[in-house]
């Protein structure tokens, strides 16, 4: 409704651009903006998580490319989105700690998506992302998957569960991080 009434055009024009950006790919069934909105419903009502979902794909319109068959790709959107989220959150006067955590989650929300992890990979990921952010990142990744098309959803969720299980085992073993 805020988009349709042009409210977001005033305070979050980046979102309007996302609403107008198609995702022509088997993994997606919505525009970027529609996917963002859908993803919000898959995280708890936590400020950091909701902001991370609002911004997790905000960089996609800036990096979109398309194959000759029309399939869209968004390489590097995590880093671009994190920089955009930082600017937006400064503009909207969010506190620095919230902005830093949200930007970290945005930057790394696709980290390890194609990797079948072992404990060493989990330790490396936690060291890169931060132990304070890792469990939140798993929630962001789950919401992202749930808001995508059904294509390979079960496989993606199984892989994510493995990341989570190995993380919990590493913490229990005192290996993190």
Predicted region positions:
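Proline-centered turn/helix-capping motifs that create local helix->coil transitions or kinks
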Residues: 2-13
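C-terminal subdomains that position terminal phosphate/3'-OH groups for nucleotidyl transfer/ligation
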Residues: 17-18, 25, 35-38, 42-177
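Short Gly/Pro-enriched turn/cap motifs at secondary-structure boundaries
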Residues: 27-30
């Amino acid at each position: 409704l805020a988009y349709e009434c042009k409210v977001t055009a005033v305070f979050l024009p980046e979102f309007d651009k996302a609403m107008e950006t198609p995702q022509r790919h088997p993994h997606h069934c919505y525009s970027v903006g529609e996917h963002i909105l859908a993803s919000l419903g898959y995280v708890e009502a936590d400020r950091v998580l909701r902001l991370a979902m609002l911004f997790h794909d905000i960089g996609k319109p800036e990096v979109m490319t398309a194959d000759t068959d029309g399939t869209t790709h968004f390489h590097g959107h995590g880093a671009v989105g994190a920089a955009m989220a930082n600017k937006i959150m400064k503009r909207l006067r969010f506190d620095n700690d919230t902005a830093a955590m949200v930007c970290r989650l945005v930057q790394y929300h696709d980290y390890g998506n194609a990797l079948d992890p072992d404990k060493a990979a989990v330790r490396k990921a936690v060291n890169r992302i931060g132990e304070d952010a890792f469990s939140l990142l798993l929630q962001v990744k789950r919401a992202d998957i749930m808001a995508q098309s059904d294509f390979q959803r079960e496989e993606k969720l199984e892989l994510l569960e493995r990341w989570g299980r190995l993380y919990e085992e590493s913490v229990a073993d005192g290996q993190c991080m």
